[in-house]
Amino acid sequence: MIHASAIIDKSAKLDKDVSIGPYSVIGADVEIKSGSVIGSHALIEGPTSIGKHNKIFSFATIGGDPQDKKYDGEKTYLEIGDNNIFREGVTVNRGTVQENSKTIIGSRNLFMAYVHVAHDCIIEDDVVMVNNSAIAGCVKLEKGAILGGFSLVHQFCNIGAHSFSAMGSAVSKDVPAFVRVSGNPAKARGLNTTGTVSYTHLRAHETSL
């Protein structure tokens, strides 16, 4: 269902069962796949492709111009997979031609309220970014990584699979897989045992199948 107050650009491509809430704006060159739900007052700008069964809540801004002085109106992209949740006030920017020209988000990720994902970032699957965490340009979050509330990640950092960055961490270096970090500057505090156990259990289950 598309609410009568929503504004949809003529070039946008929406599958028939996509839901658009009141006063939301869907811009040019936006594609939204089946089962996705866009709440009220959301803004989605293109070129942006959004997969199936995503939920985008009120006042999220998805696919906005990169916050980079070098950006001069070039055509850059945002790609989003399936089954992601973008809570209230989340911002996700497109890429820049100086880097990948594309911001990429995988599937089954949770972006809590007021999270920021900058230009050219790559977010794999099953990532959690807790409220008010933010990542600068060209950051990569590997599968299952968790950023605690108010965590900040410096540009070009790689955050390893199933790692955990505690609340308020200021991350300026790469974080290895399965490692737990905290502090300003963030330092390694040991293994993320919860993530390690979950991953080991999952791998054992997959092997048994």
What are these regions (language model features)?
Residues 200-207:
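Conserved small/polar residues in nucleotide/adenosyl-binding loops
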Residues 188-194:
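Acidic/polar active-site rim loop that often engages polyanionic ligands
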Residues 2-182, 186-187:
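Structural signal for interior beta-strand "rungs" in well-ordered beta-sheet cores
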Residues 195-199:
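Short, glycine/charged-rich beta-strand-loop motifs at protein surfaces that mediate ligand recognition
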